[in-house]
A protein has these predicted regions:
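Catalytic cores of carbohydrate-active enzymes
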Residues: 5-9, 15-136, 194-224, 231
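Non-catalytic C-terminal accessory modules of carbohydrate-active enzymes
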Residues: 117-121, 139-142, 150, 154, ...
Length: 249
């Protein structure tokens, strides 16, 4: 949404995989099941380049894969295009990937370690939608500043450019709970509620990651869903419910 992500995006690919799994679950379509397995393998290989997979036949962009594998990427890539890999951290894409069982335990631990310096930078345990922030000193700034329909919103630390979206934090918490981690969702929930009047939660569109001020529109249902997801991720039976939703296992 007005952010310069192009090519094969992590978010779109995991949504497609989820749709195929649900299609197979509903219609018992064996071809869809095989297609889903092929796509699952391609996502796991291509979006987390490693030296051990450098000759894997499923690689889509060999040069970009090799370059990113040598950089020791600690999380899933955001997108793959003819230019190479976009290695911004995409919270929404990671949330869906974790929910669908696309990351190993080792990779999950790497993702959490990657988030720790982000939490220190932000000053609290809240997860920006995309990271790192693009500033006017970065080469991506030119693409970002012209990429809007009516008014420019992606100032540093705002909107998708480092803004903290409750809905995506909720989804990420669900992904963490599927991996057996309820501590992170609990910590995120407490950090978020410190910024809110718990008797009258703002449910703003996003929170600026530099000032921790509520921004954008308020009283949004999808921001409220983030709170629902966070609470569900802490409950002990959330994992069984999610298995039914995602058809992961």
């Amino acid at each position: 949404d007005e952010y310069p992500i192009e090519g094969h995006t992590l978010y779109d690919n995991v949504l497609r995989l989820w749709a195929l799994r649900l299609d197979n679950k509903l219609f018992e379509d064996e071809e869809r099941q095989r297609q889903a397995e092929r796509i699952k393998e391609k996502i796991r290989i291509n979006f987390w380049p490693t030296p051990s997979n450098i000759d894997h036949p499923a690689i889509y962009h060999q040069r970009g894969f090799t370059d990113s594998a040598e950089s020791d990427l600690q999380h899933l890539a955001c997108a793959i295009s003819p230019k190479g890999y976009d290695t911004h951290f995409d919270t929404a894409g990671h949330a869906m990937a974790m929910l669908l069982g696309l990351v190993s335990k080792k990779q999950y631990d790497q993702i959490l370690n990657y988030l720790k310096p982000i939490f220190r930078h932000v000053g609290t345990v809240l997860i920006p939608a995309l990271w790192p922030v693009i500033t006017s000193d970065d080469p991506e700034w030119t693409s970002l500043k012209h990429n809007y329909s009516y008014t420019f919103k992606n100032y540093p630390h705002q909107y998708h450019n480092g803004g903290i979206w409750p809905v995506w934090m909720g989804w990420f918490a669900l992904g963490a709970s599927v991996n057996g981690n309820t501590h992170l969702p609990e910590t995120v929930l407490k950090a978020w509620m410190k910024l809110e009047d718990v008797e009258d939660v703002n449910f703003s569109e996003y929170i600026a990651s530099d000032t921790l001020q509520h921004c954008g529109k308020e009283r949004l249902c999808y921001s409220a869903s983030g709170l629902i997801f966070l609470v569900a991720s802490i409950r002990k039976n959330a994992f069984d419910k999610l298995k039914l939703i995602t058809n992961t296992y």
